[in-house]
Amino acid sequence: MRIIYTIEDISVKGGAENIITQKANHFATEYGHDVLIVSIYKDERPASYPLAKGVRLISLNIPFIAKNCNVICKNINRIRMLLCLLKRFQKVVDAEQPDIIFFTLSLGALLLPFCRTRAKKVYESHSARQFTPYHSLFYPMERSADTIVCLTHGDAQNYKKTKHVCVIPNFIEQPKRSVADYTRKKAIAVGRLEAPKGFDILIDCWKRVAEQHPDWHLDIYGEGSCRNDLQLQIEQLHLNDRITLCGRSNNIMDVYPEYSLHIMTSRYEGQGITLIEAQACGLPSVVFNFKFGAVDIVQNGVNGIIVEQDDCKAFSEALCKMMSSEDMRKKYGENALEVGRQYFKDNVFGKWVELINTLKQ
């Protein structure tokens, strides 16, 4: 079977790029499919994640829209970019004659309804629809897609006019080590240092609990445009010796077991892959009830604590509750291991195979 995956920029190191690359690799190596990844923006920069031998990669080399021009100029350039994108992508589709095309992210949604092909068209939603750029332009895609795949049941409710909507969560590799040390008074948070991840809120919450728990330390892993602002916030709150911005880890799954508590303050998520990773490593989680995914993964009082969005006082109280009890962390962490196993690749990938077999009929 010939499969095409679209992706906006294969050189970006993010959760969506990681999971798309893993799926392409698995389809090629384990099932023998002919897989092509079409990167819209990529030029000569290397792919952010390794590609299997059977996966081909081409770039449409669509230029980025300049940020320093006025609104009229931006809109004109945006139209030119989209027309160029449609033309170049159609040329690839005509040459490849795929059986299935997986469209991903915002530009994928814009491409889908205009692509002329006999292939089945599948749109993958990697972020909650209402928080996705250009989501108001998704209606043609909704009507044109053969299937829309969402990460959560909450996001699936956003698509009402599609022939078929299904829910397939992200998957993770089974960790080499999945026993956390619950005696350690160290908490971890992971994600891009960008506004949607809510690390500014987390730092404020940590200030509230710092005096009550002077022996606890918070490490934040990730990089992004907000790093300098977050570092300044840490310094202004005199938390330099209590919070560390650790940068990006090459293998975060080896890092989680060094901690006894996972924290997530996202304002919204597609699903929350770092939450799944932490659970699979036996870490209890304190999370905001972000849209969407928290309630799909965390059962309040079983494998973590869920707090209503942006309630910093309640979040700080939940942190104190977890930090004060090693027994609670151990109990919730053991339950988290069971939850994490549900998202191992071997337990999830069969749903993708089932979807492809259904589309072939």
Features from the language model and the residues they span:
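Donor nucleotide-sugar binding/catalytic pocket of nucleotide-sugar-dependent glycosyltransferases
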Residues: H126, Q130, R143-R177
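Short hydrophobic beta-strand element within catalytic cores of glycosyltransferases
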Residues: P284-F288
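A conserved mid-protein helix/loop that constitutes part of the nucleotide-sugar donor-binding site
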Residues: G14-Q22, K185, R192-R208, S225-Q231, ...
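Conserved acidic donor-binding segment of nucleotide-sugar-dependent glycosyltransferases
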Residues: N289, Q299-G301, I305-C312, K321-E326
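A short, well-ordered alpha-helix in the C-terminal region of glycosyltransferases
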Residues: A314, K321, M328-Q342, K351-E354
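N-terminal strand-loop element at the rim of the active site
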Residues: Y5-K13, H26-I79
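Short His-centered aromatic/hydrophobic patch
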Residues: L85, F103-A109
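Aromatic "clamp/platform" in nucleotide-sugar-dependent glycosyltransferases that forms part
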Residues: R248, R267
